[in-house]
Amino acid sequence: VTEYESCRQLYYLFYDGLFTLSDSFSAAPNLAESYTPGEDGKSGTLKIKHGINFSDGSPLTADDVLYTVNFIKEHPATYGGCVENIESVTASGADTLYFILYEPERHFETMLTFPVIKANSPESMAYPVGTGQFAAGAGDVGYTSLTCRKNSGYHMGRPYLDGFTVRFTNTDLKASASFSSGESDLLFGTDIDVSSAEKVKVYEGRTNRFEFLGFNAAGALFSEDSA
């Protein structure tokens, strides 16, 4: 589940992170109860909240977090940056983990926002099992749609919706056509402007994701003061 950037929007429906980030980039506990850093800043102890279950009813434990960290290290495409400073992590009992870092990191909790997956989940698993507010249900053979149901045991309260269906398309044009015709109620992941379509409401919101634009100041293009 950590390999594909295109699935990121679904992660937040099926999975939870140990911490969440606010608009001011401060970390708030989610699956984690607390994180206590060591004096050297290169180690720390994490406690997991009690009473949290996966959508299949199995309890969340420290082994699940340990498995997730190691899985991301092996498949770093999307969340590799969150774990690259982790030298080692060990589980102690059902609710405690010890982290050793390569370098001191003052706000290490802000890195612990990746989705936690169930330990020993087969990579070939068709439908994800997470602690999030929704659980994946039936999908068609061609993986063009996925039916999702509410997770009645969600640790932060019952979801507002009972369920919904996700439809996957391979072009922006198909996605916008489905939305404009009323077949789909929500659209994301496309650059096509559909704001002019009938009965469409456009909502804009801030995110805490960064985009980086770098300039080679030593290059010939920037050798002039006017540049």
Which residues make up each language-model segment?
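N-terminal lobe/hinge region of extracytoplasmic solute-binding protein
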Residues: V1-E39, N70, V129
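A structural "hinge/loop" feature
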Residues: V1-Y11, L31-E33, S58, F108-I117, ...
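Aromatic- and charge-enriched surface segment that lines or borders ligand/interaction sites
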Residues: E33-P76
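Surface-exposed binding/hinge segments that line
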Residues: T36, D40, G81-S121, A135
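Alpha-helical secondary-structure segments
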Residues: A62-T68, D162-G163, F210-A227
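Ligand-binding "clamshell"
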Residues: V83, S195-R209
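Gly/Pro-rich hinge or "lid" segments in bacterial periplasmic/extracellular proteins
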Residues: E105-G163, L173-K174
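Ligand-site clamp/hinge motif
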Residues: S152-S195
